From Swiss-Prot:
EC number: 3.6.1.-
Protein name: RNA pyrophosphohydrolase
GO biological process, one term: mRNA catabolic process
Record's function text: Accelerates the degradation of transcripts by removing pyrophosphate from the 5'-end of triphosphorylated RNA, leading to a more labile monophosphorylated state that can stimulate subsequent ribonuclease cleavage.
Pfam families for the chain: NUDIX
Needed co-factor(s): a divalent metal cation
UniProt cross-references to HAMAP family, sorted A to Z: Nudix_RppH (MF_00298)
Chain ranges of the Nudix hydrolase domain: 6-149
Keyword Hydrolase carried by entry: yes
Keywords associated with the record: Hydrolase
EC class name: hydrolase
Domain of life the protein comes from: Bacteria
Naturally occurring in which organism (per UniProt): Pseudomonas fluorescens (strain ATCC BAA-477 / NRRL B-23932 / Pf-5)
């Protein structure tokens, strides 16, 4: 599903532990790291997509996490021209994302990247909250900065 402007609806997942660190995942067979993310199907809400992607990419269930916050609006990034599939219709030029800040409330041993037939990640680690800004691919950096900045105050609030 691609909107009229060419952006694919998507959710981004910032999973935190009790130390305030975030889960940083390595793309399979690459030296590229990112937060888990994935598309929103036509019949899904962003929250539905969050839980589906969380299970597919990280192996966690709804009961393993607590939602702390979600970005107010959509955050957009454009794909570099070399990644745009110019022969696909409708043309997708980027992603528009709702970002969720989650707290892991179960044991971290529940994190599994290999539960699907086509895993997206082959490794993960806990990193400091702002660490991803200096590590993510350049074209996603501004969206990461905006999401982390907007959601940071909720990390400090313990319900």
């Amino acid at each position: 599903m691609i909107d009229p402007d060419g952006f694919r609806p998507n959710v981004g997942i910032i999973l935190t532990n009790d130390a305030g660190q975030v889960l940083w995942a390595r793309r399979i067979n690459q030296d590229a790291w990112q937060f888990p993310q994935g598309g929103i199907n036509p019949d899904e809400t962003p929250e539905d997509a969050l839980y589906r992607e969380l299970n597919e990419e990280v192996g966690l269930e709804r009961e393993d996490v607590q939602i702390l916050a979600c970005t107010r609006g959509w955050l957009r990034y454009r794909l570099p021209q070399r990644l745009v599939r110019t022969h696909s219709q409708p043309l997708c030029i980027g992603q528009k994302q709702k970002w969720f800040l989650l707290r892991l409330i179960s044991n971290e041993q529940r994190v599994r990247m290999d539960l699907t037939g086509k895993p997206e990640f082959d490794g993960w680690r806990w990193v400091s909250y702002w660490y991803p800004l200096g590590q993510v691919v350049t074209f996603k950096r501004e969206v990461y900065r905006r999401a982390l900045k907007e959601l940071a105050p909720r990390l400090l609030v313990r319900d």
